[in-house]
Swiss-Prot record:
Name of the coding gene: 22
GO cellular component, one term: virion component
Source organism phylogeny: Viruses, Duplodnaviria, Heunggongvirae, Uroviricota, Caudoviricetes
Name recorded for this polypeptide: Capsid assembly scaffolding protein
Keyword Signal tagged: no
Family per similarity comment: Belongs to the T4likevirus capsid assembly scaffolding protein family.
Length: 269
């Protein structure tokens, strides 16, 4: 809208007044004066349009750069905020779950201890022919039943706790991967993801991930250098439409270097 308006204004420039003052003291025919005035006015309008388009292009370019900059800053802040909120939320869930199931977990541990003690008492009674009164048998049966219930509940609780720990590790792993690869290209991110696939989150994950990211960056630089070398033909051989053997040897050597880079990364783990 602004571009069309400026161009339209430039095309409406009236140069006839300035020409009248120029030709005031010159003896020239009206036809020549009109022809010259037409050419002069067309030239002025043409340059005015080009100047307007140039200014509009610069303004648009600056606006796009500002928008892109603001967009990147907003995305970075959003990612950081999401990661912090996710970490806090997961920590809260873990603490809440442990608080809610503390009694059940404690009972499970106590049940195992009680089972061991009860088994030892039974063996002791049998060895020494100790007779247990009938009224005590009911108490023992009730305790065994309660013990069985706790034994059945304990595996479920521990399985749920392990699942929550695994989910926490998964989120922390994804956050670390996202933060480490945010400055990489999409192809570089895919390479890093492929190399860390199967690696579980641990204390050493961050250092291993950093090493892989650096190796991927270096390998991409090597690939760019090799591509430039291959695409640059030999000056003397250009007329014969072929690439020299030296370039082919360099390309082969570069490919071997890239393979060695990934081999070094794999050997670290």
């Amino acid at each position: 809208m602004l571009k069309e308006q400026l161009i339209a204004e430039a095309q409406k420039i009236d140069a006839s007044v300035a020409l009248d003052s120029i030709f005031e003291s010159v003896n020239i025919s009206p036809e020549a004066k009109e022809t010259f005035g037409t050419v002069f006015e067309a030239t002025v309008k043409q340059h005015a349009v080009k100047l307007a388009e140039s200014h509009i292009a610069k303004i648009a370019e600056k606006a796009e750069e500002e928008v892109e900059k603001n967009k990147e800053e907003a995305e970075e802040k959003a990612e950081k905020k999401i990661a912090e909120q996710a970490s806090k939320f997961i920590d809260h869930l873990a603490k809440e779950w442990l608080a809610e199931n503390k009694l059940a977990v404690d009972k499970g541990i106590k049940a195992e201890l009680f089972e061991s003690m009860l088994g030892g008492l039974k063996e002791l009674f049998v060895e020494h022919n100790v007779v247990v009164p009938e009224e005590s048998v009911d108490v023992v049966a009730e305790m065994e039943e309660e013990l069985q219930e706790h034994k059945e509940e304990s595996p479920r609780l521990f399985e749920e706790l392990n699942m929550r720990d695994a989910y926490i590790n998964y989120v922390q792993r994804e956050v670390a991967l996202s933060e480490s690869t945010k400055d990489l290209t999409e192809s570089q991110k895919e390479k890093v993801s492929a190399l860390v696939e199967g690696m579980d989150y641990s204390d050493a994950f961050s250092s291993k991930l950093s090493a892989i990211v650096e190796m991927v960056k270096k390998s991409n630089k090597d690939e760019s250098t090799i591509t430039e070398s291959i695409n640059t033909p030999d000056t003397e051989a250009a007329g014969l439409n072929f690439v020299t053997e030296a370039v082919e040897d360099k390309a082969a050597q570069g490919a071997e270097d890239i393979v060695s880079v990934y081999a070094k990364v794999a050997s670290r783990f």
